[in-house]
Amino acid sequence: MAEDTEYKKLPVEERCVHKLWKARVDGYEEAAKIFRELDDEKSPEWSKFAGLIKKMVVDSNALAQEKGLEAALIFVENSGLAGRTVGDVMTGIVQKCIAAPKTKTKELSVQVALMYVEIEKQEAVVEELVKGMEAKNPKIVSACVAATTLALREFGHKVIGVKPLIKKLAPLMSDRDKTVRDEGKQLAVEIYRWIGAAMKAQISTLPQVTLKELEDEFDKLKGERVEPSRYLKSQQEKQAKIADAAATEDAYNEDDGEAGVEEIDPMDLLDPVDILSKMPKDFYDKLEEKKWTLRKESLEVLEKLLTDHPKLENGEYGALVSALKKVITKDSNVVLVAMAGKCLALLAKGLAKRFSNYASACVPSLLEKFKEKKPNVVTALREAIDAIYASTSLEAQQESIVESLSNKNPSVKSETALFIARALTRTQPTALNKKLLKLLTTSLVKTLNEPDPTVRDSSAEALGTLIKLMGDKAVTPLLADVDPLKMAKIKECQEKAEIKIKVAGPKKETRPASAPTAKAAAPAKTVAGSVDPKPVTRPATTGARKVLKKPATVSGGGATSAPTAALKAGGKPLATEREITPEELQEKSEEILPAEILNGLVDSNWKNRLAAVEQLLGEISGFDAKQAGISQILIRTISGRKPGLKEMNFQVLKFKLDIIRSVAENYPLTTTTVDLVINEIIEKLADAKNGAAAADVLSAFAEATKLEYVVGKVLSFAFEQKSPKVQSEAFNWVNRSIIEFGFQLQPKTLIEDVRKGVQSTNPTVRASAIQMVGTMSMYMGKALMMFFDSEKPALKSQIQVEFDKNVGEKPPKPVRGVQRSSGGTAGNSPDNEDDDGGAAGEEEPINMADLLPRVDIAPQITEALLKEMSDKDWKTRNEGLTKLQAIISEARLIKPSIGDLAPALAHRLVDSNAKIAQTTLAICEQLATAMGAGCRNHVRNLFPGFLHALGDNKSFVRAAALNCINSFGEKGGYKEFFESEMIADALKGGSPALKTELWAWLADKLPGLPPKSVSKEDIHSMVPHLYAHICDRNADVRKNANEAVLGIMIHLGFDAMNRALDKQKPASKKDILAALEKARPNLPVKPLPKGKHQAPIPEEPKLKTVRGGGAGGAPGIQKSATARVAGGQDKQVPARKKDEDIDTSPLLCANSAKNQRLLDEQKMKVLKWTFVTPREEFTELLRDQMMTANVNKALIANMFHDDFRYHLKVIEQLSEDLAGNSKALVCNLDLILKWLTLRFYDTNPSVLIKGLEYLVQVFQVLIDEEYILAENEGSSFVPHLLLKIGDPKDAVRNGVRRVLRQVILVFPFVKVFGYVMEGLKSKNARQRTECLDELTFLIESYGMNICPQSAVREIARQISDRDNSVRNAALNCIVQVFFLSGEKTYKMIGHLNEKDLSMLDERIKRAKKTKKPTPPPSVDVPAPQRHDSIEIEDAEVGNGCDELPPPDEDGTFDQAPSSQLLLLQQQLQQLQQQAQQQKPSGPFGLDSQVISEIEKDWVRVDQMEQKPLLNVDISSLDEPIKVRPTRAGIHYPQEKFDRLISRQHYMQQTLTTSPSSTAGMTSGVSPYRSPMRLQHQQPQQQLENNIPNLADVLPKHDPQLVKVIKGVSSTDTLKARAAINELAAIIEAPEKQAVLRDYEEIFIQNVLAQFKNLSQIPSAQSVVVYQPLLSILYTFFHANILGKTLSVACIKNLMSALLNLMADPKLAVGDDSQYNKVINGICLKVLDKVDFTNLNCALIRLLRETCPEAKLPKFTDLLMKCIWRNVKMLPERSNELNYDAVILEVHEFMLALPSTWWQNRPSDTPMRTIKTILHNMAKVKGNAILQHLNQIPTHSELHTYLIRILKNFQKDGSASGIGASPQRAKEIASKRISHQTHDTVSQIFKLISDRDTKQQGLQKLYDFKQQNPDIDLSTFLQGSSAPFHKYIEEGLAEIERNQNAGSTQDNRTDVNYQNNGPDPDFWMDRLQYHMTGGAAKLASARSADDGSHMLDNKVVDENLCLNGMNAQKASLIKREKRDMSPNRLQHLQAKLAQIKKENHAQ
């Protein structure tokens, strides 16, 4: 048995490949377990198993194979590497699994296949399954078919492509195996379910019996709705949202109930065919034959080809289309015309969208041919024009359509109208803009009145269809002049019309998301007439809804149309709304506005109107922005109520305009509302007093809608006015708006308006317009001047002067933009945040060529001109070309539509007359310039002619052809040149001259073209010709072909070109390979292949932009390309190339080119060296920079070689050159570093390691020379270096660390720190770990000066990282920060969860044991000297030295600034020096004489009479503590509790401590120190000092107790109540309460969590938990030792929850208000129990967070009552208050909510409450409160207010009342102290201040107080410190105790336990006081409060004297006190607890 299980000791990976099948099963199961636990798909663990998955699925053992499939399924589902395994795994599944005997194995194999589909590997899965369908085993075939069917059923046809499956149906259906046939049938049915009837054509070849069976199955599926049941992983989240949205919408949309099959285009299932190659060679010749039968034969052949091959391959069909068009237009035989029309229809259908290039030439001819009346011809023409329309649009053919509707022939008009009607049934409404709609409607209305009834009927049908499509609202207003009879006919046609496509109509209104307000009477469901703003033409976009099977219909009036001015290119429509009727307006305005305002607006007295508008303006911001139509209601109320905006009083009008502006700024605004008032506001621009206000209103309108829309309205209305003032001011406003908003306008429209202004006769208007033109010139440049070329010279000179003012000025940045409202309306929703809102962004460059009006020269290209150009006489042809030149020159800019001119020019390009060809080339170049980008449409026709001319024998023709090609390329792009293999055809049969020129052109242009701009297939077609020409006999051809190799290699790559060599002859391979190898070094470095999860690299601009110069045209590219390819070889003889190519220059040259490179990068002239993966542009840039810097050419070639061995050679050469050429290294350092960064992205480790070794040498040289890296050098190197710090190889990581440590010495470490911080964002856990280690090193080396607080917070976030190494590194880094910053670290790290914080605390504890904190080097101050630790017998002894206590090792949270720290340490040193000089000789460093003087009157303890102790039965202490059982089984273990209570080994330790540790231990609790830290720090310090305490000997974070506490927050009420009962048993027992001391924070958090849970369930269910929960909370705060150390945040959250419960009537069930009483009692307990400082801070913080929120008023009132209660207690508890913390919290309140914020609030009571706190603190502290303002800026509101308070105190004489309450101050003032009494007390205090007489002074002071009990001594203690107060009080108390003790032997054991005596809590607290060291607390208080560096000398002397007296007193007590045994201490604790319990019971 031992041998059988031996394999379990092996790693999982080895078990998975073990020879023993049981071991493999175990390995597979363990692997599956590991896969389930991995939650990171990119975890390195996945890579260990990636290669094993394929073996798991083909395991020879059946059981192991099953387990392997289970593991593989989990792997594929969760791993990011699963995609890499699909090929091997699917092959194994198909071969071994899918037809396995075991059912589970088959099921698992199918599930794995489906999971691969889910992770988007469906192509590979289908490919393998299709291969399996060809297997010999029928079981495998049937299983593969079944799996494919299942995948198609679950994922749908969009994921599983059906095209390859349809091809397999025929063999599957005819297979001899019945199972295969049945599965094939199921697959066919499933395919039909998804694609419908489109499949039938594909299976028509099947046997009729099979077809009949399938048809029967298909009929069963009719009407079935199909949807995927499973989605790809990338779609799942999106589909879930879509499904939810669809479910919601379907509830309100009944018309979507019908199910339908999403139709698929049958053409998508076909393969395209090239029919051009199949056409007869004599086709065109036959088509020109005179005999019609021959022409018919030619067309029949074409028709057969088109019928047999419905889908056509892309190609050059221009000649075929022209031939068919010629037959249609010219042929007199109607049969041939019909055949040509049918062929044209088939051709258009076969090319689909690709026919668009030919549509414009065909449509006019077809419309014209409709004059033919033969039915067969008309039918054929209809089919043709309908097929062509699928590739074009009505807008593109509008001119031809309008012209045909004006034709004289009625048939043409009728058929054109019918064509429009048919086209509209297949057109989306959005395709018809307002201009086109108006044009069509106007033309059709004209034909509607034709005398021919056919024309009228056709026109009515077209108009009816138009109304059906667009809606009545859009079309009916354009039919106002149509008589009723014709309108009735149109309506009849509208009803009959049927839209044949799914119209993306406007989205239906759904229910409002929230209920309407109480005032608004809006219906529950929005109706069509709603005034809610909505997009005008917003289509429905429900992605989950399928297209209905039957054609959808659109009801009239369903769509609305937006004004074209409201649209911007690529923008979204503006919001509109329904115009409210006057009755509705009256009703709604009365609902929201008071009657006095409405009446005042129409009052005849202007003063009343003024008062009304003033009142309305003040209330304008208080309305509900979500109320429908609020803007329209308010604006129309102002403008619609007489006198409205016709107001004659300028003051009233000013307020009205301000109201409208405020509405536009604060509420959603639509164009409907703007249109109602904008004209009246534009008129007010001319108002002398209110013009500016009107302009502000227009600007507000522009912000709320769009600037373009408002500007259009303003200028349009201004020119309708005759007032020059209005026009002038309108131009002025537009001018200002352009500057404020940026140029967010359509320049073309604006230019037309401004030209009107420039041409105005009024000089003011003209001047304003000219000024606006000058502003426009800043945005549009000097080209704007061409629009004013036709103006008069004087006017042009004025415009030029304005242009000159703005020469060289950049447009200012926009300061205003589209308003972003949160109202939630359509007009201001995030959906409408388009580009118009980006006011702050840079304006897009304006293409002036697009703005210039273009002329359509198509009408001028007449048949006569074309005939003249094709005349046989060359002179006539030349005259025709000359006329054409004149036409183009006159038009200057033309439209791309030039009719049949392009084919005519193509014939002239190959003209036999060279002069004609040259002229034609010049015309083509002229066309490109005049046409712009549109010239690309004619490349297919003209480019073959250009290439022909490029091979002409005459050089001037070749030069003209080259210029023409370049012009077309620059204007329209080069992509079209490479399509259709035009270049390949030219190279194939061209002349040597053509080959030479064409290869030269390609060598020039190809390197500069972006890689993806040209299809690889098109370039690949040139490779065979390239190889042939490399070996051509012509030397020039060979030379230029060799030069073109690099350009082609850039696009195809070396490997692809190398593979193409296989088809070459062996004799040619050597030369071709040599050419490839020569070009290869110049090839740019390839970027890393993109992984599955890597973001795609965006396509970069052309290479010319890399150089960053101004002129980036063709010459620049040509020059650079030549330099890259040949390196000057065109000047050399090829025979001597090998010798002359050797570069003997130094590797690196010393020059000053580096400075220029740095300047270029700073000025953004070149690319910044920042990238994720190196792209080609960066490689080319670096190569060019190296060439410019004269780097050795051979070195450059090796640097950019694809083979890594060349890179190693480069590094070796550079290393050898380093020693003797360091100056050159510095000059080229940036280039070397950049090249090495490229190597960081290579995968070869040898290059990487060698490169790092070289970098170590380089930086050592730089360090020796004390060189400092430039900013550009460091920023281009360090970030890339950090990428390799997380490399898996140790050698690489170590090298990177070594280099980085060197970089710090030559580059500012602060910047290095920033780059390392950026490295934390990496997804690589190892990189994050290393970066954190480097940050630790930097912080340790350079201190906290380099580490901002935000960086510490970011580092702390890494503590919660999943990776353990990252967590440890982050913890180490924060520990280092803690050593330097102390407790301040906790504030810097921000919020951490409990788990992370506990880890950090534990790590800090451990680190402090091994390493002491060292101050950062930035503060060079000598450390304070510490005295040796002194062992004492009790913790009550103080420091025993008259110096400030040394700082606590744990530090404090709030550290003083560095300057204050320096001052404190200097003062500390002085005090230490004084102490050393005057060091007493007595014990503990005290003065023995003083000790003797103090001891002389004391009575020793052993001399006192012993008084018998009370006989108290303490047997109960030995009884076990009973724990109440609960139903949930939650309890604290009894044996553990007993062990904790009686842990004797802690009690028996020697009680020793040191002054420093004691002082540190008992320092006051900082209000900012979290309770979690207190739990760790205080017990740790107590254990270190061996101070016994019940709570301290308990375990910290006992898991069982934590489980009980966390049970309180359980959502299970039974479990929660059980946990509450368990805790109640602990809290109610005083002896057990100490257990919870360290769990207070956790307990409160869980209580709050339960409160949150209860708030979400009904009251009836929650009450049963509220009762015990509130009870235990009351008990908790009623306990003596609990609740005192809660943090500020915990108190704030608790008080918020309690006050919310009191404010919320949820718990007030019936008349019973007991719950509120209980909660009120809890609040009072909290206010009395918790730390007073933390309480005040928490309440102030809660008030700060409450005020801006919409909290219940009762909540705020309760909160302020709590604060007022604290204010009343302030004089009594002032000693407990940390003034610094409270004042800082008040400061934060005033910063967040300053006094200005309260001015607009209805009540400022909270602010006055806060000021009351300050007032009372100032009254208590007096001027001393200024000592607590260290953290408050002097310019703050708090500081100013305190100074004002103190000044008032001085005036009132109240500043002396420090430390007294107001009531006490009155009592003191009422009592007149005599001068003699005052002198007496002063003499007594002088005695106390003297060391020799202080005891005598205390006795006299006690006697004086006994004799004068009415005199308050606090008056005489004003100005002294708190420790001196405490010394006086304790001294008097000690004397009183001695007096009362009388003859008793031990006054500390004479305790009266009567009920009227002190509360037992007092004795427990006093016991705790003695245990933890009362004197230590005094020392801590002294260190916290005395502020010695701020007080005067008198107070300092008093404090120092006090220290000495404390030391003497402590020393005496310790000598006389007996040892207290641990047992006695334990029994005393238990006895006091018992007495306390009895006291409570009574």
Swiss-Prot record:
Impact when changing residue 292 to E: Impairs microtubule polymerization. Disrupts tubulin binding
Extent of Acidic residues compositional bias: 831-845
Record keywords, A-Z: Cell cycle, Cell division, Cytoplasm, Cytoskeleton, Meiosis, Mitosis, Repeat
Disruption of the gene: reported phenotype: RNAi-mediated knockdown in the neurons of adult males, significantly reduces survival to 53 percent. Adult survival begins to decrease from approximately day 14 post eclosion. Pan-neuronal or glutamatergic neuron-specific RNAi-mediated knockdown decreases adult climbing behavior. Glutamatergic neuron-specific RNAi-mediated knockdown also decreases activity. RNAi-mediated knockdown reduces radial microtubules in fat body cells, resulting in strong defects in nuclear positioning. No effect on the circumferential microtubules.
GO molecular function, one term: tubulin binding
HEAT repeats: 120-157, 160-197, 270-311, 315-353, 357-394, 396-433, 440-478, 587-624, 625-662, 672-710, 745-782, 856-893, 896-933, 937-974, 1017-1054, 1205-1242, 1272-1309, 1311-1344, 1346-1383
Region annotation Binds tubulin: where it falls in the sequence: 1-505
TOG 3 as annotated region, ranges: 581-814
Region (TOG 2): 267-505
Ranges where the record places region TOG 4: 849-1087
Domain of life: Eukaryota
Assigned protein family: Belongs to the TOG/XMAP215 family.
Domain notes: The TOG (tumor overexpressed gene) domains are arranged in a N-terminal pentameric array with each domain composed of six (for the most part non-canonical) HEAT repeats forming a oblong paddle-like structure. Intra-HEAT loops are positioned along a face of the TOG domain and bind to a single alpha/beta-tubulin heterodimer. The TOG domains in the array seem to be structurally and functionally polarized. Differential functions may range from microtubule (MT) lattice binding and/or free tubulin heterodimer binding to potentiating stable incorporation of tubulin into the MT lattice.
Protein's name according to its UniProt entry: Protein mini spindles
